[in-house]
Amino acid sequence: MSASPHIIALAAAALLAACGPAPASSDAPGEATPPAPESPAAATDAPATPTAVQTAAPAPQAAYDWYGRINDEERSRSMVLAYEVPETDDQPFNLSCEEGGERIFAGVPGADPAVQSIRLESSAGSKTFPVKTSEADELNGGRYLTVEIPGGDSVLAGFRQSGWLRVTAGAINHAMAAHGDRGAPQTINRFMAFCND
């Protein structure tokens, strides 16, 4: 399944930017937040542990699913795992990594410029991560935001096991569940292995 070159370019650019030297004042990923929902524009500056999941797993959406693409045209191979409608530009969320890099970058398009953190939730709990890069999103408007997540993070481990993930970035809130009969769970598992093994 192919996604818009614009989306892929943004994901690749964010991945390359994130791989460069971090600013001296950069916060560590996976910073802690209290269990209460964060303000849409609130930044998170203190490390936090996952909070208990308060809501049930979401149901799969008919048109959407998780699709993976490997880019082996560069010196180091990378992979994108996108939640999207195939053959369209409708891709509200993606994960990307370099092979064996043990760090994963989550990308959210069309976000409010004031958003400074992204919250992820899976069957293992939830965490809030500070925004690492923010770029103009010409396709969706607003900003294309990325956060960096350790490859072995417990929220991602829960996603790998259950096949669902929720993302909150200001007013943006997506509940994203894999279709078990389309091969998406296997794609998710393959992505996580690609990033961490």
Please state what every model-predicted region is.
Residues 20-28:
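Bacterial lipoprotein signal-peptidase II cleavage site
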Residues 97-141:
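Mid-length scaffold segments of soluble, non-membrane domains
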Residues 27-37:
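Phosphate/adenylate-binding glycine loop and adjacent helical scaffold
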Residues 1-18:
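Sec-dependent bacterial lipoprotein signal peptides
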Residues 38-113:
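An ectodomain-focused feature that recognizes extracytoplasmic/extracellular
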Residues 21-22, 126, 131-197:
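Internal interaction segment
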Residues 91-99, 118-123, 157-164:
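Extended Gly/Ser/Thr-rich low-complexity repeat segments
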